[in-house]
Amino acid sequence: VNIVFSSRVPRECRSELEDLLFFNPRQHRVRDGIIDSLAHFGHPRVEETSSGLSVRVGDHEAQTLFAFDRDKKTKAPVGVVVFLRTSAEEIAIPHVAVDDEYALQGSEAGVGLGVTLVEKVKEIASRIVGVKRIVFFYRQEVVIRL
């Protein structure tokens, strides 16, 4: 598996991105966290920008990191994490989605893609002056200290 990361998705991958975000077959496992996140931040939506597709959450300006498998023929993402700065000291992760093949019991599970995406946000957060913690909403507001 050859995973790379980007903040944009090609426009032609809209339906695959929507499937990943909104119709993920494993989302029932974190249903309560999703409901909490939606109540707190609003609904995610796919938006077209001049450089491709991104994800917006409610009225918030969110950052999005997409994972792509270079070994796949498709340009569609295999994972996504949405995060935003909620205060001077905090970044929240309201949404994470991983293609079923890359989930814990999937055929490509060895990459630990969900954990890798959260770790990437942790790397980014550690470079932002003042940020001291990341709050992950899918697991009863897990707090990751930096």
Residue ranges and their predicted role:
Residues 1-105, 123-135, 143-146:
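Non-catalytic substrate-recognition and accessory regions of acyl/acetyltransferase enzymes
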Residues 139:
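Active-site beta-loop-alpha junctions enriched in small/polar residues
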